[in-house]
Amino acid sequence: MKVVKFGGSSLANGQNVEQALNIILSDPERRVIVVSAPGKRNDDDIKITDLLIKYANMTLKSENTDEIVQTIFMRYQEIGHFFGVADEELKVIKDILLALPSRNYPNSSYLMAAFKAHGERLNARLIAMIL
């Protein structure tokens, strides 16, 4: 059994995810897959983790987060659409994002860590949908 990890730039868009999946599927011994949050698609782009940090900060300031949630979701949606994943299946990702502010966190540091961790969590869910 082999464990493989893919970083953010390897999972930044549909084409990169496709290359990662080809690597995974080329060896049946690759059974454990560890994924990072999607990284930058180009030099001017923003990593999902940075968008989640912004989302957390906006939540802590009680600011409207509709736009940042949509921006984050659209990144996952774009990758999902590349593989033909239906919007109905992808909706769970948006639902998880929308639920983050309503969870109980012991303090702001915990909230920040939880928001950031969702980059990987949501990407793992997306890759599972694709596979």
Regions found by a protein language model. Name each.
Residues M1-I130:
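Nucleotide/pyrophosphate-binding catalytic subdomain
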